[in-house]
Amino acid sequence: MHEMILCKLGEVVLKGLNRRSFEDKLMANVNRRVAKCGNFRIYAKQSTIYVEPKDENCDIDAAFEGCKKVFGIIAVSKALPCEKDVQKIIAAAKEYLADEMRAAKSFKVESKRADKTFSLTSIQLSQQVGGALHQAFPTCEVNVHDPKLVVHIEIRDDSAYVHGPAEEGAGGLPIGMGGVAVSLLSGGIDSPVSSYMIAKRGVKLEMVHFFSPPYTSDAAKEKVLSLAKLLVPWCGRMTVQVVPFTEIQEEIRRNCPEEFFTLIMRRFMMRISQRVADQVKAKALVTGENLGQVASQTMEALRVTEDVVDLPVLRPLIGMDKEEIVRLSRKIGTFDTSILPYEDCCTVFTPRHPRTKPNLEEVREAEAALDIEGLIDRAMANREFVRIKF
């Protein structure tokens, strides 16, 4: 038998009558993720997704790394299947974990029996396998309290499986089970993290980016597309709709009070994002807004910003401080790209003294001089669609 991958399910197992649809979606997501790594058989049994190579050309290491980023999976391990026979299990453990046993100074064996018809109890199996391994690798001591290596034996309905420590999975729910949302993606640290957090709840994302040439460069746009590519392994395939925003910002600067520049700009972003959401049948908007980080993120300012839409505005970063956001940005691999020093449309025409506690009626009055619908129509008509795949 050949090495394979075991993906342990998380919240999916709690879904009751809907569980099968969640498992089907998760298997489809895993299949999509490992497709470029070779020809694999994907199937689900006993709260586990099995990823089994069909031939020797499969890149199981690449598939393993891909599985770790699939939402819905809490743990991933490479394992060697074998017959449900004690001597076969011992032989498999000696062969499969030989390098780990030689490198470790201590070990223990943990056994689990999903198949209760197996002749030995979990403790008895651990004792027999542990004794045989210690005899084969005498420099590796048995330590059941603080081992350097844990050898796992799983007795399941179809086979026994031998593996070392599992690695952490992405958690969450399978992409596609939580509906569709439109995420406002800028070039900063926050919006990629907020997109990741919403995708983790099973939401498929459509991205919108606002681009303001010549005030923002092509390099700034490419930076955002690079961020989207970094999100794809987590969030799945997506389309980034690049919306030209220059005319809107120039009209705001010409016709509106400076203290409201940022607020009115963000109200336009929300209006356009809702238009996009209506087109792609999304049920929510997602932003990287926090509470109190900048002048436009006070409670009063957030209220003014979302006044122009009727969809829910999801702000997953609202309770996090900057250090937590940066830490998560590093984890998902977007931080180094996010801090590249390129312009962003949010920094264009920044007011010197922004209003931190704006009055909604004053803001509505300030933007009344603008041809709101005409500006939005022209921006929507000139969008660029960039499709990003694995």
Residues covered by each model-derived region:
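RNA-binding accessory domains that recognize and position tRNA/RNA substrates
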Residues: M1-V182, P192-M238, D307, R355-L360, ...
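Active-site adenylate/phosphate-handling loop in enzymes that bind or generate adenylated species
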Residues: Q128-L133, A166, G171-G178, F245, ...
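Structural beta-sheet core signal
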Residues: S183, M207-H209, V242, T287, ...
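Conserved G/P- and acidic residue-centered "switch" motifs that form tight phosphate/ATP-binding loops
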Residues: G188
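A conserved beta-strand->alpha-helix junction
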Residues: A228-N255, D344
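Small/polar glycine-rich anion-binding or flexible loop at a beta-alpha turn
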Residues: Q293, P341-F349
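A short alpha-helix-loop-beta-strand transition element characteristic
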Residues: G333-P341
